[in-house]
UniProtKB/Swiss-Prot annotation:
Protein name, per record: Late transcription elongation factor OPG110
PTMs per UniProt: Phosphorylated at multiple sites. Phosphorylation is necessary for cleavage activity. Phosphorylated by the viral B1R and F10 kinases.
Keywords (A to Z) from UniProt: Elongation factor, Host cytoplasm, Phosphoprotein, Protein biosynthesis, Transcription, Transcription regulation, Virion
Thylakoid among keywords: no
Role description: Involved in the co-transcriptional or post-transcriptional endoribonucleolytic cleavage that generates sequence-homogeneous 3' ends during late transcription. Involved in postreplicative transcription elongation on intermediate and late genes. Also involved in DNA replication and in multiple steps of virion morphogenesis. Required both for inclusion of virosoplasm into crescents as well as for maturation of immature virions (IV) into mature virions (MV).
Region Disordered, annotated ranges: 25-74, 80-99
Biased composition (Basic residues): 49-67
Organism, scientific name: Vaccinia virus (strain Copenhagen)
Location of the protein in the cell: Virion; Host cytoplasm
Induction comment: Constitutively expressed in abundance during viral replication.
Subunit structure, as described in the record: Interacts with the DNA polymerase processivity factor A20. Interacts with B1R kinase. Interacts with the late transcription factors VLTF-1 and VLTF-3. Interacts with the late transcription elongation factor G2. Interacts with itself. Might be part of a transcription complex composed at least of G2, A18, and H5.
Basic and acidic residues bias spans: 25-36
Family (UniProt): Belongs to the orthopoxvirus OPG110 family.
Recorded name of the encoding gene: OPG110
Entry GO terms, CC: host cell cytoplasm; viral envelope
Amino acid sequence: MAWSITNKADTSSFTKMAEIRAHLKNSAENKDKNEDIFPEDVIIPSTKPKTKRATTPRKPAATKRSTKKEEVEEEVVIEEYHQTTEKNSPSPGVGDIVESVAAVELDDSDGDDEPMVQVEAGKVNHSARSDLSDLKVATDNIVKDLKKIITRISAVSTVLEDVQAAGISRQFTSMTKAITTLSDLVTEGKSKVVRKKVKTCKK
């Protein structure tokens, strides 16, 4: 298949390769900086890290304002409750407790340090007790571990004693054999000839 270029009536189209080369050369020399794929002069803006939006505080819910009648009714209900509780229970009333606490605070303003000292002493005693209990647990664990170590050491020593005893018995038997051969040589003058069985290897 052959390629062919047809001449058109339009004069703006290129007809020769020389014209195409000249056009490409001119476009390469006169190209704009904006057409560059990787421009060097362009400043790239830095990306900003995303920040969380500040949360707007919620508006407090509108509280219902109580009227004077409701306040009076609440006071009456509270007084009735206090009266019934005072009649039914032999314990002192709330007012008596508040008054006694206030009196104690006024009278013992100088003696406030004493309860704190007692509380601190109690804390020290409690911490000392906990330290003693921790120390006891630690010593118990150490004693248990030492007992385990002692049993293992005694087991190793018995094994070594058995090995040494076996070695001694072997040495003793070899010594008795040497003594018997020596006595045979002394008495007879020569050692006895003993035939050894020769093992034959199967092919």
